[in-house]
Each structure stands twice: as C-alpha cells, then as structure tokens.
Amino acid sequence: MAKTPVRARKRVKKQIVDGVAHIHASFNNTIVTITDRQGNALAWATAGGSGFRGSRKSTPFAAQVAAERCAEMVKEFGLKNLEVMVKGPGPGRESTIRALNAAGFRITNITDVTPIPHNGCRPPKKRRV
C-alpha cells in the first residue's frame, strides 16, 4: 500500500515587536543573542563566528560586526524595540549597543547583569607578563 505524501508545512515567521538583546562580553569574545520577551532565542552571533580569530576576536569592532549580523537576522521578525542585558567586562560592551542602535532598533532599557560574587569562588591568579 502506497504511503500518502506528507506535505511540509510552510513555517510562518511570527511577528514580534519587543525583544531582549543579551550581550555576553568576555575578555576573549563577544556573544550577542536576541530573544523574545519569554527568552526564546530568535538569532545569535559571535565575534569568532563573524570571521575574527585570535586576538582580533576580542576587539570592539569584532563585537560591532557580530551585533550587526545578529540584527540583520532578526529583521524578518519585525522587531522594533530592544531591551539590552549586558554581562561581562569585555571590550565589546559599548560598541555592541551602538551597533544595535545604528541598526534601527529603539533601545528601551540597558541593564548590567554581570554576576558579582558575594565572596564565592577564588579568582584566578594575577597574570605575570
């Protein structure tokens, strides 16, 4: 008996107006993730995935390119307003926010969510260069 052909349903992109941009700026890399209000990821990009390797990965320009790539990916969702959550001490903190602003998003709120220990784990030893 022949199987009936299964038609693939066309995926409809849902229209989302408000989103949250999570920026993880470490000393070595910058990760930009744009989610909806519930935390479901819509798009993400990294400085390393944007073609930068080694020490160039940890530059503000690499973070800017990653933010531009991520912004380009979420344009199809109709995103207009962004709330920005910045985590980490890296060099890509400010340039990422500037790039998202230049991409045409209205930034409603900027929050620093860098985890600060209340005397938790011992930090790594100081570098001797």
UniProtKB/Swiss-Prot annotation:
Its Gene Ontology cellular component terms are: ribonucleoprotein complex; ribosome
**Pfam families given for it?**
Ribosomal_S11
Entry's Gene Ontology molecular function annotations: rRNA binding; structural constituent of ribosome
A GO biological-process term: translation
Coiled-coil regions in this chain? none
Is Transmembrane found in the keyword set? no
Q: What's the family? A: Belongs to the universal ribosomal protein uS11 family.
Could you describe the subunit structure of this protein? Part of the 30S ribosomal subunit. Interacts with proteins S7 and S18. Binds to IF-3.
Query: What does this protein's UniProt record list under function?
Result: Located on the platform of the 30S subunit, it bridges several disparate RNA helices of the 16S rRNA. Forms part of the Shine-Dalgarno cleft in the 70S ribosome.
Query: What's the name of the protein?
Result: Small ribosomal subunit protein uS11
The organism encoding this protein is: Glaesserella parasuis serovar 5 (strain SH0165)
- Lineage summary: Bacteria, Pseudomonadati, Pseudomonadota, Gammaproteobacteria, Pasteurellales
